[in-house]
Amino acid sequence: MNVEIDISNVKLETERLILRAWEITDLDNFFEYASVNGVGEKAGWEHHKSKDESLEILKMFIDEKKVFAIVLKENQKVIGSIGIEECRQDLDKNLENLLGRELGYVLSKDYWNKGIMTEAVSKVIEYCFKILKLNYLIATCFNYNVASKRVLEKLNFKFYKDIIIKTRYNTVEKSTLMLLKNN
């Protein structure tokens, strides 16, 4: 079962990061990382071809109020995002009547393998479980995206099931659905 999300007035902080709602002024930073070949593709979407495309998606992030911008404290640069999406997968009866959401995330290629996404997702998990009182979170990663799966494993997500995902750029990817319960 999904719960309503509105992060428009939420600001989360970690040692290196600020997680906050997107702003129109983030457009240049967003386009900078979203236009790099291979970044969006690891999350199921094609890299952006124009600033106008990034602007449309940025407006959607702002309107939907469920996607955090990941901001580096040291320079206030937006380097990625984490969405708290509605669960889109068929889950078993044990989860049917519980409150849950699906996490999706992407990070600028310049910041891969620095522990940043683990730090950011950890803070969002804390928010989802302590503030939103969710019972569980799920996340999906393509089987070839070992780094993304490793982030989830470090944060105690457990294998739930193998699935197939059709991406927005019309490929079919073998994927793993991971589950984290709020105990």
Regions found by a protein language model. Give the residues of each.
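A short helix-loop-beta-strand connector motif used in the catalytic cores of GNAT acetyltransferases and
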Residues: 58-69
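Conserved GNAT-fold acetyl-CoA-binding loop/helix
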Residues: 38-59
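Acyl-donor (CoA/ACP) binding surface of acyl/acetyltransferases
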Residues: 1-40, 67, 71-183
